[in-house]
Amino acid sequence: MASKEIVFDTKARERLARGVDKLANAVKVTLGPKGRNVVIEKSFGAPVITKDGVSVAKEIELEDKFENMGAQMVKEVASKTSDIAGDGTTTATILAQAIYKEGVKLVAAGRNPMAIKRGVDKAVEALVKELGNLAKPTRDQKEIAQVGTISANSDTTIGNIIAEAMSKVGKEGVITVEEAKGLETTLEVVEGMQFDRGYLSPYFVTDPEKMVCEMDEPLILINEKKISSMKDMLPVLEQVAKMNRPLVIIAEDVDGEALATLVVNKLRGTLQVVAVKAPGFGERRKAMLEDIATLTGGRVISEEMGIKLENATVADLGNAKRIVVDKENTTIVDGAGESEAIKARVKMIRAQIEETSSDYDREKLQERLAKIVGGVAVINVGAATETEMKEKKDRVEDALNATRAAVEEGIVPGGGTALVRCCKVLDDVKPADDDEAAGVTIIRRAIEEPLRQIAANAGFEGSIICEKVKEGKDAFGFNAATGEFEDLIAAGVIDPKKVSRIALQNAASVASLLLTTECAIAEKPKEDAPAAPAMGGMGGMGGMGGMY
């Protein structure tokens, strides 16, 4: 085991502080509408240019082990804020730096770090409550577009596309971000329920030019198991043929004799039919088949439920207005399920989303929810080069997360103004002693820092701007994009309340942890072994030029 280097007290905190400063100083130049770019070298390919705080933070590794510890802790603030709120990473980093910087000075002057932490916690709690009072719900598509625009570094195209996507698939809908083939950034909306399984044989297509199978008013047979034998399916097929309606078969698989018979009947024109594999795997497949059954008003033919395929009747089949099946996807439009049953299914999935601790499961459950409730919107991000594509895709994902946060908890004035506006509530915080009061003072000073930095990045003096904003009321603040003081909500400079809240809570949490650090331990750097002496030339090796 390698020997360790141990540093204590002020020395430990100072070295951690140097790392915090290095990371925060690199990240904070990106803040605001006039934020600067950061160029990041890549080990292969072109360097990346970004204005995304979390992308900058992720790239930073420092040589000094203790400084690196400080930097990594603040990196955690940025990542955590990005994961939960989708934006506010730079704000969180700046707040963490400001809280820690002020706190280190006070601890060095003899204040009790635990009491300072208690003061910080009390102040943050009061501010979070006040942010809730300041927040307003998002009223319309225009406000959603404004949130998206600001989070995407003032790109109105991105803001408008996200707002349009939300209006089309609803607040519960799934919006995914993909890379486009061309230069344009476009929105594609899939209405109804879509899943990523296509037809099992190209002979099922009804439009050979587009290679799709389209059916109006089809019946839908949902079978949990594999179908190989035709005799099991014959009774229900005969009933469907008498009704002269198209049939969609969704099963674990259809192969052998069953598939061949369906294809032959389709080609002869006896039966309009298409067979599709069931989506998902294992337990998720069962759940998705139940979703399809609920949406279409059918039943899952499952031996577990006591229904065998040979006993199935038309009453067990689902109905839909239209179904479109291509090589890779199946879309069910306007299923005939009962609204009460659909509502109950939605309620059940929502409860599962609340209970699950796995991010992957949560994402899959949200996708299922969206497929039942609304639909799926895909934002195809286009750009001229791959470097620009990556940067733009990052911005779209940030903006999308920020708009979701705005819809969830409402909006507050942007540009760092909301936190400054909440400052007055700190007068009512009752600290138990002077050291706790010092913790409250740290927060009072730290919450001005994002506004100061936005102003500084735009080429203004932060302190002057901050004082002017403090004199105003409500949404009055500084619009760094225009250099004007105005009503920020009316001007569209708005932030999601959730972003401000999460940024403040995460920053205070990590800064308090660092403040109460009394000892830091890291591996000692390894001494380089002395280089081996250079080998002298080997004599007598001349004259070998003729060898090939």
Curated annotation (Swiss-Prot):
Location of this chain's protein in the cell: Cytoplasm
Protein name, entry field: Chaperonin GroEL
Record carries keyword NADP: no
Matching HAMAP family: CH60
InterPro entries listed in its UniProt record: Chaperonin_Cpn60_CS, Cpn60/GroEL, Cpn60/GroEL/TCP-1, GroEL-like_apical_dom_sf, GROEL-like_equatorial_sf, TCP-1-like_intermed_sf
Catalysed conversion reaction: ATP + H2O + a folded polypeptide = ADP + phosphate + an unfolded polypeptide
Subunit structure: Forms a cylinder of 14 subunits composed of two heptameric rings stacked back-to-back. Interacts with the co-chaperonin GroES.
GO CC terms in record: cytoplasm
Enzyme class: isomerase
Pfam families: Cpn60_TCP1
Natural source organism: Oleidesulfovibrio alaskensis (strain ATCC BAA-1058 / DSM 17464 / G20) (Desulfovibrio alaskensis)
One GO BP: protein refolding
EC number(s) stated in the UniProt entry for this protein: 5.6.1.7
